[in-house]
A protein has these predicted regions:
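M16/insulysin-pitrilysin zinc metalloprotease superfamily fold
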Residues: 15, 35-94
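Conserved small/polar residues in nucleotide/adenosyl-binding loops
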Residues: 1-5
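M16/MPP (pitrilysin/insulinase) zinc-metallopeptidase core fold and M16-derived inactive scaffolds
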Residues: 14-29, 41
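Short amphipathic beta-strand starts and helix->beta connectors
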Residues: 27-34, 129-132
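Active-site lining segments that contact anionic ligands and/or coordinate catalytic metals
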Residues: 27-31, 42-46, 142-143
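Amphipathic alpha-helical interaction elements
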Residues: 9-13, 68, 72, 110, ...
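Buried hydrophobic packing residues in well-ordered domains
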Residues: 6-8, 24, 63, 87, ...
Length: 157
């Protein structure tokens, strides 16, 4: 996963300032939790949410609408910077320990896209634009959607 992907995921559903958290969860009250994640080794993105069965269709529609809105609508400077600062904050302590450095470079090797130092990654993150984010999100399409629910007649434990 490149740094642009990480910012796109943070904006869509990977942080408490994301569209999924602020709109689908907080504003619309359609789920208990709602978050996106990017699987860097498969190139797939997932959205996980906890919803009431009766709200499942509305929640799915709202989740997909937020993705479409990010692809085509306005992205405010404030929301982009909030997500960028959140990621930069998470990267701040990488070089504070040998384990942090080791983990950073281990993941860089596994990704196979060339080694990038933490400083280079932070600089790249600072350079990501709204259009970069839109371009990443435009590449996504719905592949599968499923709803896990309990069987009728099974008592809550």
């Amino acid at each position: 996963m490149c740094i642009r992907d990480r910012l796109a995921m943070a904006l869509y559903g990977g942080s408490v300032t994301s569209r999924l958290f602020l709109n689908v969860r907080e504003r619309d009250h359609l789920c208990y939790y709602c978050a996106s994640s990017f699987q860097s080794f498969t190139g797939s993105m997932a959205v996980n949410s906890g919803v009431e069965h009766a709200d499942a269709a509305r929640a799915e529609a709202a989740i997909l609408k937020e993705l479409d809105d990010l692809r085509t609508g306005p992205i405010t400077d404030e929301e982009l910077e909030d997500c960028r600062l959140s990621l930069l904050s998470g990267m701040a302590g990488i070089e504070d320990s040998l384990g942090g450095i080791e983990t950073w470079y281990y993941m860089e090797v596994l990704r196979g896209s060339g080694l990038q130092t933490p400083d280079e990654a932070r600089a790249a993150l600072r350079a990501v634009t709204k259009e970069d984010v839109r371009a990443i999100l435009r590449q996504l399409s719905l592949s599968v959607s499923y709803l896990l629910t309990r069987e009728e007649g099974i008592a809550d434990v």
